[in-house]
Amino acid sequence: MGCNQSKSANDVRGNKVNNVNSKKKNNKREDINDGEEIAINPGMYVRKKEGKIGESYFKVRKLGSGAYGEVLLCKEKNGHSEKAIKVIKKSQFDKGRYNDDNKNIEKFHEEIYNEISLLKSLDHPNIIKLFDVFEDKKYFYLVTEFYEGGELFEQIINRHKFDECDAANIMKQILSGICYLHKHNIVHRDIKPENILLENKNSLLNIKIVDFGLSSFFSKDYKLRDRLGTAYYIAPEVLKKKYNEKCDVWSCGVIMYILLCGYPPFGGQNDQDIIKKVEKGKYYFDFNDWKNISDEAKELIKLMLTYDYNKRCTAEEALNSRWIKKYANNINKSDQKTLCGALSNMRKFEGSQKLAQAAILFIGSKLTTLEERKELTDIFKKLDKNGDGQLDKKELIEGYNVLRNFKNELGELKNVEEEVDNILKEVDFDKNGYIEYSEFISVCMDKQILFSEERLRRAFNLFDTDKSGKITKEELANVIIRGFYFFTYSLFGLTSVSEKTWNDVLGEADQNKDNMIDFDEFVSMMHKICDNKPF
């Protein structure tokens, strides 16, 4: 379930956990005490919930089961949305991975906490979204988004093989997610079609990487040494217990091979037979099965299935291969209206109010549905040219240029670069120099959808922790700081940010100057951040 690492890798984790949200090299560390700058991110809202899970959700049906427990489809009691809840038995540890029985349960629980900490840090359109965590005497409960489309594995069984366009769109999404993980120093270690879910059965354009139970933080200075994974997809260096993050790239190469011809490159009657073939690393492109497949596809497979992982391509290189660029979807004229609306909403957004930032990010990342996010998610992925799950300045400028080519109605912009700089200043909530997926969704979505009374009330209640109908600076500090420190640190770290800073945050919305924010003031603040700039 978790990451049973060597000592050296565990040492690395201590340095990586606090930096897991630093999105690209040379980014400054996310730190709420850095120059009194409060950085806002969606991981703040994933927390260990108090009370019994049955008070918040009721069971609809069982979705599946595994070695560590089961996955249930549940519905919110106070809402309408469905969630998938992973139920993990605290007593279900893998005894084969530990020698000292007295340490088994403690080690297993540590792995669960590691998985939770890892999941809460991730913000990518092709990676599963974690909402809440519950815990009782017998179980851990991980509340995640529900994807009704089932496993990619089922699609492979039903369709046997895919044409190159469909295969490229699938691989682009998988590689984008893997590229994002690797840039955050995370290796998945169990990429396979069973761990790729579809949002719905009717489309291959929105898939999700799931099951981070074997995932681990990594460092360029240390090699991973645990033999983990699934026979068909495991990399040869993992069998030798000396590997790095490129083991995920090998697994992607195996998946791509299967998508295009319908069978794996390394087959066998049982796991032992398969592993023997993986150890040799020899595979073939049978002429009859591959004669109509492009040379670009075969070349990419060769790069991903390079036996020597030091010479194997990276996930980013695979994502930017000729095959992906040629066969996967790009922005077209049908996307013009959505893209124009997205850029318009970003231009109008005023992001100086920290409480408003936190509230809109909570609504956009935690309360919106897959269907509501669908069009914007597609646009985000198409704007994200390098596929790293973030929009940089260059990609935003290219988005404007695409609209210019379509003779859009966005209006004449004299200085696109200056416009993009302003957008980054306002929309980059976590201050890392890029626009993340949830930041994009939250700011770009139609505010009539985003700001329903129910959603505004739920956002207000998030901060009004004592349910008094007023938000105080103590409640703000509790929610913000508690969001940064999960399972590890004190929930009451008011000294981490100065009293003046909290007063300033409160004062941004406190119209009657009573040092508290009521619901009407909260609603007024939310509308102002989106309406105070002319379009």
UniProtKB/Swiss-Prot annotation:
The active site is at D190 (proton acceptor). PROSITE patterns: EF_HAND_1, EF_HAND_2, PROTEIN_KINASE_ATP, PROTEIN_KINASE_DOM, PROTEIN_KINASE_ST. GO terms for molecular function: ATP binding; calcium ion binding; protein serine kinase activity; protein serine/threonine kinase activity. Disulfide bonds: none annotated. Ca(2+) 4 binds at D510, N512, D514, M516, E521. Ca(2+) 1 binds at D384, N386, D388, Q390, E395. Residues 1-34 are annotated as: Disordered. This is Calcium-dependent protein kinase 1. It comes from Plasmodium yoelii yoelii.
